[in-house]
């Protein structure tokens, strides 16, 4: 996993650069921007619907924990850039419960998940 995370840390620099470009374009065009972090079903916790340990679940070649750690690198970049640039962000990764009723796979949302996200979004939008 260490080598994978090292590669992702390199990619994170390009990701940050892209986020900053988006912010610059929006500011230049007077567009209100809100970033959202990406939730993932897997990671720490037990799925309340299935009883599945979301850390140990094997998805492709990585465990739930490994997938969660990889995505967290990118979510942390969003959080950091939003603080530094004073851009609003809604931390869906922290606000959306880890419950399979909200997902139809590891990161794509079910209809119920989309409804929940819209609720979280409007509760937190400034």
Q: Which residues does each predicted region cover?
A:
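Short glycine/serine/threonine/alanine-rich loop segments
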Residues: 31, 86-87
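A mature extracytoplasmic/lumenal domain signature
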Residues: 37, 93-94, 113
